[in-house]
């Protein structure tokens, strides 16, 4: 009997050890330095930021918000930030530099934020831009490439594009003459319409893209992580992804609370404007295969327009971190 008891205890101990062996070691809490570009790209982050400040998350966070994406590129290269929310094409450019301090994309944080705004009648689609002049910013960058792609897909060959250096210049043109046709990013599009009741949203370039792109999406912003940090703190990155997904979801489920935080953190000065603009700002958190499908097709369009816009080539599969957030 004693021998049987000893054997049973030994088997129980062995099973316990095997069960424990299957569980990965729990990674200690990490300190994450997150950099974000001021605007729609950082709107989906505000609920996560507040949760971190309230001590509700496992890891500790330091947040930096800038107005120039090149600052974030420099910070990534120097190892001064671990995770950054940057324009999609900039992520491709940085990846294609093939430096030791490489990056991977972990999610798409912002979809399309470009809107056609005008007071003119009869403008409700890309096709309606035939024979018209459109004012916009971003010559030689993604706004131009995106609009030209949509015009090409619609068979429009006689739309003139007039470029201005700042969105505020385009907004001023609309204020002076509401019959002008403009393409503006959020939140400038919402601000222009709030300030001038004669203006209206004619159509969303993002929705127009979805209708003709065959599965890709118009991607404004992505979240990248330094590979070195990902290798050292894989569980912390997964926890960030889960928290970011929750934060983006809350932007939809609690728009008022999110708008309050957007104003609190200085992304948009006035809370009512933030509340009105938020649903139009493409806040999202696409991960895994959905992220890759959305982003790859978009970068291919940019590559065909100007290879330099994505760093000379469409990034290979190593660009995409395909793990999905775990709750």
What feature does the model see in each segment?
Residues 1-31, 326-327:
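Short, low-complexity disordered leader/linker segments with a strong preference
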Residues 25-163, 186, 201-203:
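Short, glycine-/small- and polar/acidic-enriched structural segments
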Residues 47-48, 114-125, 217-236, 287:
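A bilobed periplasmic-binding-protein/Venus flytrap-type ligand-binding module shared by bacterial periplasmic
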Residues 53-59, 131, 207-216, 283-292:
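Short, solvent-exposed loop/beta-turn-alpha elements that line the ligand-binding surface or hinge
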Residues 81, 178-179, 302:
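Short, high-confidence coil segments that cap the C-terminus of an alpha-helix
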Residues 89-90, 98, 169-261:
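Pocket-lining segment of extracytoplasmic ligand-binding domains
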Residues 230-305:
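Secondary-structure end/capping motifs
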Residues 296, 300-327:
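Conserved C-terminal helix/tail region of periplasmic/extracytoplasmic solute-binding proteins
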